[in-house]
Amino acid sequence: MPKAIKARFLSVLVLSILLTGIPRVEANNHVLFPSSEKVIYFLDVSNSSDSVNLWRLLRNSLLERLDDAMGAPNRKGLTPKKPTDLSISVINSNSSSSSPIEIISIKDTERLWAFMINKVGGGKPTEARMRDIYKDFFGGTGVYRELLGKYIQDETVIAPSTSECEKSAEENLKQGLFMDNVTPSIRTQATKEVCAIIQKLSSGLKKADATFLSGPKCKGACSDVVGGVKVAAAVARDLSKDKNAKLCIAIASDMLNNSPQITKTGAWHTLNAIKNSPTLLDAEKSGQTVASQSGILFSSKVKIRVEVIGQGGGPDFNPELTSKLDAYWSGFWKAVGLQNRQQSSLDQACSGGNN
């Protein structure tokens, strides 16, 4: 082999070895939190539901968990904790046109942790270094908790500007156990990563507050439950790109599908359909018919569970109607490829499955 070619070959080989040794950010979902689960809540804003109190309950539950919402992966120096994931959407007269409000996301959490481990910690941080990095970000005086206290409180949510948030984050990180010694560029990037989450969190909460607390209550035929399920199916399709993806769908509604787009006769008007069903089997077939006509089918690549809060209820629901309503939705869920269970409390829905 000529000397020039040999020298070029050796240079390429050395460069390849060096590049291979550079730590890479673990950007793929389900790497740092392999059993994480995406959660989406649907709140019915019709007169039959109390969406204001439902959102207050869900909001309070989320605020109580915010300090530990970023969780912790299984790494030396850390106590593993599952992160919080929460999106919220509305059931109204045309639910399928409503986009979910993503308040806090597993993907955002994993991106921040990947940055902390790979960029700040150098790829394989020691146990002591990992503990210090954790304290700088999520400890009692860490940057994440300080920004939470400044911008997100029980009743008041402030959406900070990028420059304002990053300035506060920079001042905090300069006092850190480890972050005070990193390069200015890494500290600057850290402020951007943390503030992106804080801004998304505050923006999501403000949007949800506007939708469920101050927004007008829907009157008339405005429980497009099937449209909400279509939105959930679209979320599942997006998740199917990720290996081992999980999704929990929590629906707070009386589950009496009714919207301006449907007639009062036929299977789509749930209340009339079950009242006109002689048997439980007939009610189940009505639910299957709606599922078939809706064109909804959930991806088998995603592990999905459905939890319903408040199905039926009210003075008009005797035991026979309740059984027929259960049969109706049992037929529907089976036809779209899912099973469901009923929950008594919204704040307990979709809990315990993200382990």
What are these regions (language model features)?
Residues 47-85, 105, 111-116, 121, ...:
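…and closely analogous acidic/polar surface helices at protein-protein or active-site interfaces
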Residues 35-52, 205-216, 307-312:
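Acidic/histidine-rich, surface-exposed loop or edge segments in extracytoplasmic proteins
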Residues 21-56, 109, 117, 353-355:
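Acidic, polar low-complexity linker/tail segments
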Residues 78-110, 351-354:
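Acidic helix-start/capping segments at beta-turn-to-alpha-helix junctions
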Residues 53, 256-321:
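VWA/integrin I-like adhesion module and closely mimicked acidic/polar interface patches used
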Residues 42-46, 247-258:
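DG-centered beta-turn motif at the end of beta-strands
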Residues 120-244, 257:
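Von Willebrand factor
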